[in-house]
Curated annotation (Swiss-Prot):
This is Adenine phosphoribosyltransferase. It is found in: Cytoplasm. Pathway: Purine metabolism; AMP biosynthesis via salvage pathway; AMP from adenine: step 1/1. GO terms for biological process: adenine salvage; AMP salvage; purine ribonucleoside salvage. Its EC number is 2.4.2.7. Homodimer.
Amino acid sequence: MEVPTLELKKFIRDIPDFPEKGIIFRDITPLLKNPEAFNFAIDQLVNKLKEIEFNTIVAPEARGFIFGGALAYKLGKGLVPVRKPGKLPYKVISEKYSLEYGEAELQMHIDAISQGEKVIIFDDVLATGGTALALKKLVEKAGGEVVSMAFLIELTYLNPRKLLSKENIISLITY
């Protein structure tokens, strides 16, 4: 069964007031559970990314790992995992940032990106743009160049492109 692009929204569950009151959480676990929907989403993202010249996908935990790993495999690229503090075993660089519902920090191994390496940032959801901007800063601290940012879901009502106005942004599903 092939799932049309617009139908992917049927596999995303809205959870009101999570993780706090006033937030609508877009839960992708039904999409992940459905093999046709998950494969279709990956294939659609691959089609959007395959013409871009890059070496590595940088993806934050946890849901970014799921899609980032699948995309890196399908595209024959490397994957750099970005984690919360204290989760990586080697020397790290860090970046603090604001979330839709608070503050956070991300870390990446200091040697994960080479000087001049072309990178695509991938995350499951683009909300305010804060996480994506923090990821870009980490890549640039390491000497890399972000050539594109890709997302499964973009929450356009939060206007994330304002913060990321200079970025090449690719989104599969918008709300």
